[in-house]
Each structure stands twice: as C-alpha cells, then as structure tokens.
C-alpha cells in the first residue's frame, strides 16, 4: 500500500517517515504557561531531531461539567497562538467545535482538528474542508477503525485530502478505554494510506462513573506509547504539564513536562528501529 504524505509546511507526515510529534498542553491556561511549555518542547525536539507541531485547545467545549474550565476562547486563543508562532517558529494544531470557527482558526494555525465526539457531523466536516487546511481527525471512541474511511471521504468530497487520522482509544465497557494496535493499519488501509498518529495521553483516560472529570493512568504513559510506536506510525500526539496534579484539564493523563526528553528519546529510538526494517508482507 502506497503511503500518503501530508505536508504541514516543511514537515512531512507519513506512516513510513520519521515520526512527527504533535505535543503541547491540553488547554491554554495562560499566555505565560503556553510560552513556557512550548519553549520546552521546542528545545527538546530540536535537540533530538524530531519534527514538531505545538498542540493546545482554545476552548474545551465538551467538558463533562458546566463548571469546568474551558479555556480563553477564540479571540484570546488566536492571539496566544500567533505569539507562539512568532516567538518560536512552530506549527500549531488546535481543535474546532463549530462550523463558524473553522475559517478564522485556519487563518492562524496550521492544522485544525476534528474532535472525536464530532467526527460524523457533516456540516462541521464540510466547513473544515473548505478552509484547505491540514486536518487531524480524532477517531471516535465508539466507531471501528474501518469506519474512518467514511469520514475521510467526506473531506475529499469537500475538496480536501490533506487528512491525518488519530487514534485515541476505543470504548471498553463503561468509563474505560482500550487501544487496539491492529486498528492503526486498518485505518490506513481504509483511507488509502493516510497518515495515522496515536494520542497516547487521551487513551489513558478512565472515569469515575459519577464524577465530573476524567481520571487517568499517567504512570503507564511510557509503556503504552512504546507499544504504539512499535507498530510503525506517522506520529505521536502527547500532552504534558509542569504540574499535572494542578492542570486545569486532564492532568491525570498528562506526562510530567520534566520527563519529556527521556520519554521522547525512547520513542525516537523505537521509531528509528522499526522504520529501518524492510517491509514484510505476511498476507501470502
């Protein structure tokens, strides 16, 4: 199967190329924290030679509780993103939740993300496709990997084939997720070779059935990420925080920022080894 290459400026994203890191924080908490976290990511990824795209949300529109922090909003969020780009020269990925957000967000960032809970909303897909921006589609927890082909087809019908696919786990009973590593290649096959990336931190979520916030299994982030990288994928999606216990969203799943360099060193070593192997067809 020929692998599709998606270009984010000068960054090439493909299943058979060196992995790209889509990393940052869950939600913009403040301008200063975003600057600090982005600077750390840039320093580490440049040292390790890993292509890098900064990730953060300007609005967490799908929080479980009406009282949970959502973010600074569209206007302030775009100002922060613009400053990050000007200061560090980074590419940026963020998510949109409404059709009206797609164009103004695409004018600032480099990749717009379709949230898992909204991935089948045709009006939103069409609005995102019209921007011409690179798209990252989060696989809904409730659909099979093969169904991602239908979502990508919607983008292609809208004139945009610059689509990346992202696995963030699948429902495993109530309030729990499991990652099907076999599904990564199924998604690629269902879409004609589109790049597949793995959101390791959101895959670690687990919930209190009656709680208003997600719990997580941060202690297992390295082992789950190592397993995903061993498949051979286009990229890793990661959230980190300098103080996960006090993060405003999804702290229990976030990598402690101080561990970023040793963590990424392991991921790069695995990716380098896996992609040095010749392609092996075991289907016949």
From Swiss-Prot:
Disulfide bonds: none annotated. Pathway: Carbohydrate biosynthesis; 3-deoxy-D-manno-octulosonate biosynthesis; 3-deoxy-D-manno-octulosonate from D-ribulose 5-phosphate: step 2/3; Bacterial outer membrane biogenesis; lipopolysaccharide biosynthesis. It is found in: Cytoplasm. Keywords: Cytoplasm, Lipopolysaccharide biosynthesis, Transferase. It comes from the Bacteria. Its EC number is 2.5.1.55. The keyword Nuclease does not apply. Its main location: cytoplasm. GO terms for molecular function: 3-deoxy-8-phosphooctulonate synthase activity. It is an enzyme of class 2 (transferase). One of its GO terms (cellular component) is cytoplasm. It catalyses: D-arabinose 5-phosphate + phosphoenolpyruvate + H2O = 3-deoxy-alpha-D-manno-2-octulosonate-8-phosphate + phosphate. GO terms for biological process: keto-3-deoxy-D-manno-octulosonic acid biosynthetic process. Belongs to the KdsA family. This is 2-dehydro-3-deoxyphosphooctonate aldolase. It comes from Photorhabdus laumondii subsp. laumondii (strain DSM 15139 / CIP 105565 / TT01). The gene is kdsA.
């Amino acid at each position: 199967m020929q692998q599709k290459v998606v270009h984010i400026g000068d960054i090439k994203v493909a299943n058979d190329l060196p992995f790209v890191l889509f990393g940052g924080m869950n939600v913009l908490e403040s301008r200063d924290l975003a600057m600090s976290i982005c600077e750390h990511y840039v320093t580490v990824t440049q040292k390790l030679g890993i292509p890098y795209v900064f990730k953060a949300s300007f609005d967490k529109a799908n929080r479980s509780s009406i009282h949970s922090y959502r973010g600074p909003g569209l206007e302030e969020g775009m100002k922060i993103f613009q400053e990050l780009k000007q200061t560090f020269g980074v590419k940026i990925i963020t998510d949109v939740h409404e059709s009206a957000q797609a164009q103004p967000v695409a004018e600032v960032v480099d990749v717009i993300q379709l949230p898992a809970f909204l991935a089948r909303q045709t009006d939103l897909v069409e609005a995102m496709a019209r921007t011409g921006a690179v798209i990252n589609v989060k696989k809904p927890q409730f659909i099979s990997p093969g169904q991602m082909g239908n979502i990508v087809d919607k983008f292609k019908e809208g004139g945009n084939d610059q689509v990346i696919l992202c696995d963030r786990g699948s429902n495993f009973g109530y309030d729990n997720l499991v990652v099907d590593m076999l599904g990564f290649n199924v998604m690629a096959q269902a879409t004609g070779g589109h790049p597949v990336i793995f959101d390791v931190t959101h895959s670690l979520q687990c919930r209190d059935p009656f709680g208003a916030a997600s719990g997580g299994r941060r202690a297992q982030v390295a082992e789950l990420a190592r397993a995903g990288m061993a498949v051979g994928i286009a990229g890793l999606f990661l959230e980190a925080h300098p103080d996960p216990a006090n993060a405003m969203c999804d702290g229990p799943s976030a990598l402690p920022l101080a561990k970023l360099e040793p963590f990424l060193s392991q991921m790069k070593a695995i990716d380098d080894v896996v992609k040095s192997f010749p392609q092996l067809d075991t289907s016949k």
